[in-house]
Structure formats: structure tokens, C-alpha cells
Amino acid sequence: MKKTIICVGACLALAAVGSAIPRGVRGDGPKEAPWPRLDQSQYVGSAKCEACHKAYYDGWKETGHNKMIRPPVTEGPNRTVFADFTGKDPLRDFDLKDVKYVIGHRWKQRFIGEVNGNEVVFPAQWSMKEKKWQPYTGKSDWWYPTHKDWKTRSNFKLCAGCHSTGSDAYTQKWVELNIACESCHGPGKVHAEKPKLDNIVNPARLSTARSIDVCLSCHQAGKPDGDEYAWPVGYQPGMDLSKFWHGFRPEAGKETDEFWPNGTAHKNRVQGNTFPQSVMYHSGLQCSNCHQSHGSLHRSMTVKAADSNALCLTCHGPGKQVGPDYKTLDEHTHHAPLSAGSECIECHM
């Protein structure tokens, strides 16, 4: 089954003429690397999409993809800082004036500042749920042995590749903040100058594997062949992600930082690790069957509300070919209707 949702990316296609000015962190990129140099002149920026794709652009503007990394704003409708910077906290040895960018807005917020001319991630984060400061050390991450000192945790090497668009490992610069149109559709200059279906990447027109790779490039815990970058340097939408990134896989009966012993997710950013284990993945379903990244009325950009069973029951309701072997949902779950135990995701996600 494959629904006719148009794309996984942030904007259906790109149009109008122009170019984006590369911006971003300072610092020395690698002198030699196995990946090709990124031609940032081929990027035009998401604002160029609006003229021809306004509905998709407007929807994307309200998504979490467009709110991933932003300058600090403490009040008003465009507020980006929700952490409490008043007073002192033993976990926080930096102040709001030191913050250059804010990462995240839903579960937690991390903060980027400049140290010795390089942008780094500060060692404390704000929990949006618990409303308090927490240490951010990264001890369980594979890159920690190389970056035990937080002053070496380069925003560009560990974060920017998935939090910005058109990041170049050599120049240590990005084209646009946040996960914008060209993050999922690839460089759009050629298409903007002469719009055609075949001169822009449309994830909806890719094979199932390559379409899913677009999402997994940032929604899959793993590592590259080297130890320098924590994102798939060199990958472009439409390419085979496995040539740039190796996703972690669970080991039966073993609990890791990413997985419980039964193989289910132990932390965030592992959707791309658990989904390939599922029957849905092996049946040809794509991320876009359940998620609409051009914008949705629901959290997590799902096509139907995910905080109920509505989304799952679209395909798995009683009487459906792939539904439960019972007449009613509560007969299937053995839990009272509307209770937590009756929610599909409690057992199946």
C-alpha cells in the first residue's frame, strides 16, 4: 500500500532564480577527505520555493524542521529560548549573552556559543518537560572519547549537518539554518532557473529505499566510516545512504544506549534504526505514508493524530485485511478502551 502523499521533503520543488550566501561556523575543515567538495553555489535557499510552492512552503514554515536551530529570542511570538537563565545554576556555567544559537524546542534545548573562534555545544541542556537544567555530556555517544572536553564539541562536526542545509565539511559553512527544502530535495539552482520534474529530487518519485534514506540520513543513530563527523558527510538526497552512514542495529537480549533488550527504541533519533526491522518497512511502506513533512495539524507531522489510534487504524482497523483477528479493538488489546494499554503504539512502536 502506498498513499499519494507528495513528498518527504520540506518543499515539493524549487523555483525562481537566485542564490543563497553560505554562512555558518568558523574553523578549519579537513584538508583531505573521501567525499566530493560540496558546491554551495548550486543552492538557492528555501525562500525561492515560495513563489511557486507557497502552500508547501507555508506548511513547512510551521514544522519542527524549521525550528531546529535558531538565534536566541526571549520573548514575543518568535520566542526561541524557553530555558530559565535567571539566577545561577550549578550545571550551567554560561549565560544567555553567550548563546549564539538554540537547538530544539520540543523535548529539550541545547545551546551553541563561540569558543576560540569555533562554535561549540555548551555542556548543559534545558529539559522542556521537567523545566530544569540537566548536564549534557554525551558520554554514551560513540564520539565522546574524541570529544571529552566540551570545548572540542564542534557544532559543525557533531550537529550542523542535520540541523542546517547545505553544510560543507571543507569550508565549515552552511547555506541555510534548519532543515529546509534543499535538505530533502537537493540543490535547486538548476530547477529554479528552468523548472522541470527531472531536474530536482522529489522523494515521492524515488525508489522506496532511496526515499526512506532521505529521512534516515538524520533520523538514524549510527556513524560514518571515520570518527570526525556525526552526520553523513557527502550524502545527497537520492543517493544510497549506506555508502556514507552505518546505522546501529540491536543485538538480541542486549541493552544498549539506543535499544532495549527486545530491540525497541531506547532513546530519540532511532526511528531509522527500528523501522527497518518492521513488517511495514519490508512491505514497502515509506515514512511519507504516515508523516507529512510539508506540515500537518498533528504532532510529529503525522497525517492523522498520533496521540490516538486513528493513524494506525487507517490500515489496521477491525475488518481490514491487516487488522486484528478480533471484532473490536479492546478484544485485541485486552485493555479498556481509551486506556494507555489500548493504544497501538504502546506495544507496536
Language model features with spans:
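Primarily the internal scaffold of c-type cytochrome electron-transfer domains
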Residues: 22-40, 47, 55-131, 135-140, ...
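Second-shell loop/turn segments in exported
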Residues: 45-46, 145-149, 171
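Short glycine/proline-enriched loop/turn "hinge" motifs that connect secondary-structure elements
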Residues: 150-153, 280
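A gly/proline- and charged-residue-enriched helix-loop-helix capping module
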Residues: 139-143, 152-159, 164
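Sec-dependent N-terminal signal peptides
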Residues: 6-12
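Hydrophobic alpha-helical membrane-insertion segments, chiefly the h-region
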Residues: 12-23
